[in-house]
Amino acid sequence: MRTVMNYIRPYFRRISLQMMIKIGGTVIELFLPAMLSVIIDDYAKRPGGEGGVWLMGGAMVLFAILAWLGNCIANRMSTTVSREITRSLRRDLFRRITALSAAQQDAMTDASLISRLTSDTYNVHNMIDRMQRLGVRAPMLLIGGIIVSLVMEPVLTLVLIATLPLLAGTVIWSSKKGVPLFTWVQEGQDKMVRKVQENMAGARVIRALSRTKWEQNAFGEVNADLAARQRKADLTMARVSPLTSFILNASLAFVVLVGAHRVHMGYIGAGKIISFLSFVTIILNALLMVTRIFVMYSKGSASAKRIEAVLLTEDDLTSKAMEQEQESAHIVFEHVSFSYNKRYNNVTDLDFSIGHGQTLGIIGPTGSGKSTLLSLLMRQYDADEGEIRISGKPLQSLSKEELHSRLGVVFQYDFLMADSIRENIRFGRDIEEAAMLDAVSCAQASFIHEKDGGLDFELNVKGRNLSGGQQQRVLICRALAGDPRILLLDDCSSALDFRTDRELRRALRERHGLATTVIVAQRVSAVMAADLILVMDKGRIIGKGTHPQLMENCPMYRELCQLQLGGDAL
């Protein structure tokens, strides 16, 4: 909760003002039963006391209106403060999530991060809001009601106070049980979010393979697990309210019995007992409010801890200041090995270098480590062994901003936002119109000019109103528009026809010849003109050289060429 308190601290003045208004309204509420007692015992029984009844009754109405207005104003202020605190918390949480390394995202899972950004922040919002509304009001009504009751009728008040230890024990028990239970529920919600996310992403494949029923059953299992968790948590917490109500009603009945006896014996008047019972009702309602506060605190505290776990996560990809070495090569991998799970290597002993302005082609079967190599170059992960250098600088010595400013990237499975083509290409960067048009031309994306509005044509979610090849060309435009010094293309032309692919590669050589280009591809034709080609299999480089060299000394490359190009490969 310490981190969440840092977000609340700037609003202390507004919270204090709201609490002062709440205190004023609560104090007024505490006067009302005493005024009722005066009306019944003093004015109603006195001859000619009608004027006093009307006067005191009018004062009660005025006080009730003032208390209502004060509570309305305070509640509005608490809602505004809670909304602003949650907005700041959600903003910083989103920024921290986007700054997490790939390894940290893998550890926390996307589903859990989405859940923390949505339902957990909502729970924290409710906790802050309820604590402002009831955190002062409930204790004041409880303590104030007990004090006034003690002054008014000590015997009956002591009867009521005798039940408080039972209530306190119930509240403490619910608080201790609640936090771990609701943390467990949120973990179940993470699983459900992950299942929904998988089904939304793979909806077309699921329908195409007629696996809809199977996925519905799988979702049903996850949903049933979440329902079971919620049921256990809700049933545990649901015991609190009935138990509290039983204790309160039992104490109220006992107070009424004792009070009736004291009225019958003439120790107190009817007005005083009615007023006292009003205070008892106030005290009991305040106790119920306290119970609700603890239930809400249990939910909010569990969510706050999950949010703090993300906000307090330190960068695991730190930059280290090092002396720059003079090196002619632009990109160097020196005996690099890496493992995702730290048990077996996904890539082993990667060793190569490529000069400024040259093209590196990477080819190999699925799962050979091609995309992992790019992830290491982009420093989504740090290598376990070996060293990666860019322009003579170890990758760890470059800040994220410095590294990413050099890169232009098109991933194998990239995304387009539901926005205009212009904004998808700009992607928040300050890019001039001329640079965007040049990128459109180079990426062979002339179809954009044929769309209604050109660059201002609106895309659907994930660009689904474009064909696969058109989507890839818009993504290539995005990478080229920033004029990168290193261009990483991860199988980004797989949906292009051979003619468009050939024109794209020719335009890249002519217009971006100064950039070092790394091409990951399944097609031999996409890499055969590269200055250096890496042939990868099972995480290792099994062939390295130019196209003619590999045709002579790499059987796998030669076989790929013969399968894809036929006689043209020889």
Which residues fall in each region the model found?
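Hydrophobic alpha-helical transmembrane segments of ABC transporter permease domains
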Residues: 20, 24, 28-32, 70, ...
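Helix-loop junctions and hydrophobic alpha-helical segments within the transmembrane domains
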Residues: 93, 97, 206, 307, ...
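ABC transporter TMD-NBD coupling linker
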Residues: 201, 280-342, 382-385, 389, ...
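An intracellular "coupling" helix at the cytosolic face of ABC transporter transmembrane type-1 domains
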Residues: 9-13, 78, 99-103, 119-132, ...
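Juxtamembrane helix-loop junctions of ABC transporter transmembrane domains
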Residues: 20-21, 25-41, 63-110, 114, ...
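ABC-type nucleotide-binding domain
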Residues: 326-570
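Helix-loop-helix
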Residues: 47-49, 58, 148-162, 235-305, ...
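Transmembrane helix-loop-helix hairpins at lipid-water interfaces of multipass membrane proteins
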Residues: 9, 15-73, 150-155, 266-270
